[in-house]
């Protein structure tokens, strides 16, 4: 069996390379004698990437995943929206690691080199660092982290010096590689957060752990206790310039660590990992562990020094909102060829795939030999050359070239029934092929090649471009190998109607998309805005085997009811395609009533061809419905193209005339422009500091509510207050009531002590002039 032949770990594909890695690893560790922490010299800079598996068929892809990927951890983290929730970055996959208590070291080794820490190189380096080097800084950070933890805060627990020393000694013993019998029946003791922090300093490389916040029950899913493992561990014992800034990404679930690696050349997404969690309608930053109080105040600066931080625009929880989140850039595969195990494993997978295909083919032939009445599929006779029939999407066969199976059968039938067609011109006498129907029948298996039946069981040898019919009876569209022989529409019908729609899928074509508009992708949205006549006449040629250029989910509703429509005077085999008609038959009919249509009409379709008759009926029904309702049904009309440059999608008023993608780009551009403007304002404020201090040293007006500068040192009031007091005095002299002085408003500019006025839009004169000059 291929499942048994496929290695269950990367290092099993080439033991020589695995031995070479295990020999180099301990030699690369530098052990200073002056108390400095043990650390790697060069090998900590390597990174592993998994090969792509989409080129294999789904059945064999399942075998690869069973061999290498820890699907339970991956499914758990993805269901909790901790892993692969951001569509802007590449997907991460969890590789299997041994669960012997040393899984943290196994995961870190696999992320860098593709082998596990079976020789305990990292474990021994961790233990030696805690025993033989100066650990006062580690102990101090651990004590600070413990005092901030929930156990100390909520219980009021207090430790004396002896308690702290005992706890620290216990942590050092847990890191030992010589433990004869660990707790919980494991070979080694499990490690904790402080061990991850020490490991990041040994590797001189940040470690990011993706984990749930709560320890949950495996049966009920209820919360047991808070988890503190997840977060960011920076190698703070080293200057940032001496560290490798691409992090190691690990997953943690059910007390088990796994490496989370990217897929090589998987797509245009960014090779990065978000530094936030998306939880309860907001974005929450990942915790940075073991920071002192001064370091906690400069956390953002530390992240940018030890990581390559980039800002990514993502869609918010509210519709139409965009957020900028921080993400750490990940390294690409850089293992040298002499120690690259992924390439060897990929070559082995390709070899096993060929053997698996041959075995599957032999098993299928043996099953057919045991049951000769069972129809066989002539898929292995297909050639990679299209059929010569115009508009036919199928491929020719070795036995029927230059035609496909169905076109060859149709030609034979037309030639054998040509005299009958000349004598009987009516469409009732033509036993043609119905739209989307198949000529295959079990009685015809004895002679000649046949087309593939709609229930073909073996589809894994073909790519998605191989044109074959959907296995649903009467469906004219092409199957998808990932939908078990059904097309997208028929596969969607089989899904439970109560199943909630996935926001990442188009509701029309059911394809994974990065952005949708009202639940549908841009392609389907443009199709809904087009007129029915243009979409039908341009996308469906007259051949009964023509695969529609439009999406099947848009046309199946209108084509299926009419593909084999029977009337009282039409026989069951009277479903006729235009391609099945002969020149002799067309001589007795007239052109379609629709102007510019190249096909022929029939009396039962009121002079229209089949497609134009479908359009006629739909238009008639829509007109009748609009007359009854009094107003036309709401449609996507009067839409304008997106305002973005060289963008062919439709814009939306919700996105200021842009499509969703261009709106995010525009928002990002505005964000950078606003940041540049803010920096210009700061620089201008620094330039005006001497002048501001000089103005502040001048004498101010004696009135408490006035901040104006005196024009003359001999006076106590400014000119404005003098005029105001004179005006108030004259009014009081005339016996008129004194108007209350209106409260003055501060200048709108930040950090300005002057008062604004209405003429300057709320700014003071100086700030208004500055704003006019510099914008």
Swiss-Prot record:
Q: Which CDD domains match?
A: OTU_TNFAIP3 (cd22766)
GO molecular function per UniProt: cysteine-type deubiquitinase activity; DNA binding; identical protein binding; kinase binding; protease binding; ubiquitin binding; ubiquitin-protein transferase activity; zinc ion binding
Entry binding sites for Zn(2+) 5: 642, 647, 659, 662
Q: Where is this region: Interaction with ubiquitin?
A: 157-159, 190-192, 224-227
Sites where the protein binds Zn(2+) 2: 470, 475, 487, 490
UniProt-listed InterPro entries: OTU_Deubiquitinase, OTU_dom, Znf_A20
Q: Where is the OTU domain?
A: 92-263
Which Pfam families does the annotation name? OTU, zf-A20
UniProt region (Required for proteasomal degradation of UBE2N and UBE2D3, TRAF6 deubiquitination, and TAX1BP1 interaction with UBE2N), positions on chain: 590-640
Q: Where is this region: Sufficient for inhibitory activity of TNF-induced NF-kappa-B activity?
A: 591-775
Catalyzes what?
Thiol-dependent hydrolysis of ester, thioester, amide, peptide and isopeptide bonds formed by the C-terminal Gly of ubiquitin (a 76-residue protein attached to proteins as an intracellular targeting signal)
Q: In this chain, where does the modification N-acetylalanine occur?
A: 2
- Annotated positions binding Zn(2+) 4: 592, 597, 609, 612
SMART domains to which the protein is assigned, alphabetical? ZnF_A20
Where do the annotations place Zn(2+) 7 binding? 747, 752, 764, 767
GO biological-process terms attached to the record: apoptotic process; B-1 B cell homeostasis; cellular response to hydrogen peroxide; cellular response to lipopolysaccharide; establishment of protein localization to vacuole; inflammatory response; marginal zone B cell differentiation; negative regulation of autophagy
Polar residues bias (residue ranges): 567-580
- State what this protein does: Ubiquitin-editing enzyme that contains both ubiquitin ligase and deubiquitinase activities. Involved in immune and inflammatory responses signaled by cytokines, such as TNF-alpha and IL-1 beta, or pathogens via Toll-like receptors (TLRs) through terminating NF-kappa-B activity. Essential component of a ubiquitin-editing protein complex, comprising also RNF11, ITCH and TAX1BP1, that ensures the transient nature of inflammatory signaling pathways.
Domain comment in the entry? The A20-type zinc fingers mediate the ubiquitin ligase activity. The A20-type zinc finger 4 selectively recognizes 'Lys-63'-linked polyubiquitin. The A20-type zinc finger 4-7 are sufficient to bind polyubiquitin. The OTU domain mediates the deubiquitinase activity.
Q: Which named protein is this?
A: Tumor necrosis factor alpha-induced protein 3
This protein's species is Mus musculus (Mouse)
Q: Taxonomically, what lineage is the organism? A: Eukaryota, Metazoa, Chordata, Craniata, Vertebrata
């Amino acid at each position: 069996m291929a499942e048994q032949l496929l290695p269950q770990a990367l290092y099993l594909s080439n033991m020589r390379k695995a031995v070479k890695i295990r020999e180099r690893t301990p030699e690369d560790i530098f052990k200073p004698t002056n108390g400095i922490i043990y650390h790697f010299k060069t090998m900590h800079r390597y990174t592993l990437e998994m090969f792509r598996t989409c080129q294999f068929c789904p059945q064999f892809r399942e075998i690869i995943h069973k061999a290498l990927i820890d699907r339970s951890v991956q499914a758990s983290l993805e269901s909790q929206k901790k892993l692969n929730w951001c569509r802007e970055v590449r997907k991460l996959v969890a590789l299997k690691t041994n669960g012997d208590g040393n899984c943290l070291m196994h995961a870190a080794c696999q992320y860098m080199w593709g082998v596990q820490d079976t020789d305990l190189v990292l474990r021994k380096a961790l233990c030696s660092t805690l025993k033989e080097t100066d650990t006062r800084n580690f102990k101090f950070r651990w004590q600070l982290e413990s005092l901030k933890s929930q156990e100390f805060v909520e219980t009021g627990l207090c430790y004396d010096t002896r308690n702290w020393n005992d706890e620290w000694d216990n942590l050092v013993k847990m890191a030992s590689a010589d433990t004869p019998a660990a707790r919980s029946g494991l070979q080694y003791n499990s490690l904790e957060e402080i061990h991850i922090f020490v490991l990041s300093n040994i590797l001189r490389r940040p470690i990011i752990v993706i984990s749930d916040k709560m320890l949950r029950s495996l049966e009920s899913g209820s919360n047991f206790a808070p988890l503190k493992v997840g977060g960011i561990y920076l190698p703070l014992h080293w200057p940032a310039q001496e560290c490798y800034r691409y992090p190691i990404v690990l997953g943690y679930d059910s007390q088990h660590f796994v490496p989370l690696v990217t897929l090589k050349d998987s797509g245009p997404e960014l090779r990065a990992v978000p530094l936030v969690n998306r939880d309860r309608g907001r974005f929450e930053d990942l915790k940075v562990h073991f920071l002192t109080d001064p370091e906690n105040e400069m956390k953002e600066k530390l992240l940018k020094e030890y990581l390559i931080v980039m800002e990514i625009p993502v869609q918010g929880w509210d519709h139409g909102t965009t957020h900028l989140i921080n993400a750490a850039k990940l390294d690409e595969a850089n293992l040298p060829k002499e120690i690259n195990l992924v390439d060897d494993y990929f070559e082995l997978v390709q070899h096993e795939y060929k053997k698996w295909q041959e075995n599957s083919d032999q098993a299928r032939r043996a099953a057919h030999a045991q049951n000769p009445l069972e129809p066989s599929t002539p898929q292995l006779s297909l050639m990679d050359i299209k059929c010569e029939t115009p508009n036919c999407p199928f491929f020719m066969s070795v036995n029927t070239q230059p035609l496909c199976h169905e076109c060859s059968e149709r030609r034979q039938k037309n030639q054998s029934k040509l005299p009958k067609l000349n004598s009987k011109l009516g469409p009732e006498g033509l036993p043609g092929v119905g739209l989307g129907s198949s000529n295959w029948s079990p009685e015809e298996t004895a002679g000649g090649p046949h087309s593939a039946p709609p229930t073909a069981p073996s589809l894994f040898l073909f790519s998605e471009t191989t044109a074959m019919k959907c296995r649903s009876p009467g469906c004219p569209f092409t199957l998808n190998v990932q939908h078990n022989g059904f097309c997208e529409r028929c596969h969607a019908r089989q899904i439970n109607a109560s199943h909630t729609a996935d926001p990442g899928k188009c509701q029309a074509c059911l394809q994974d998309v990065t952005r949708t508009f009202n639940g549908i992708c841009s392609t389907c949205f443009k199709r809904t805005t087009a007129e029915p006549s243009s979409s039908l006449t341009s996308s469906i040629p007259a051949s009964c085997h023509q695969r529609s250029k439009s999406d099947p989910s848009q046309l199946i509703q209108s084509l299926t009811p009419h593909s084999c429509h029977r009337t009282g005077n039409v026989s069951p085999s009277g479903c006729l395609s235009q391609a099945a008609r002969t020149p002799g038959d067309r001589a007795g009919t007239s052109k379609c009533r629709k102007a510019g249509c190249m096909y022929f009409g029939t009396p039962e379709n009121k002079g229209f061809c089949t497609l134009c008759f479908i359009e006629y009926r739909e238009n008639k029904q829509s007109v009748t419905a609009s007359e009854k309702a009094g107003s036309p049904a709401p449609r996507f009309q009067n839409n304008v193209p997106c305002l973005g440059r060289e963008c062919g999608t439709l814009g939306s008023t919700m996105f200021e005339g842009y499509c969703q993608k261009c709106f995010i780009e525009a928002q990002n551009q505005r964000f950078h422009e606003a940041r540049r403007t803010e920096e210009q304002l700061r620089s201008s404020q620094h330039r005006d500091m001497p002048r501001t201090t000089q103005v502040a040293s001048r004498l101010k007006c004696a009135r408490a509510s006035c901040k104006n500068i005196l024009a003359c040192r001999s006076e106590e009031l400014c000119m404005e207050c003098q005029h105001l007091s004179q005006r108030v005095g004259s009014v009081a002299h005339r016996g008129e009531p004194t108007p209350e002085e209106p409260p003055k408003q501060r200048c709108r500019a930040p950090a300005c002590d002057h008062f604004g006025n209405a003429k300057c839009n709320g700014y003071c004169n100086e700030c208004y002039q500055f704003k006019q000059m510099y914008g």
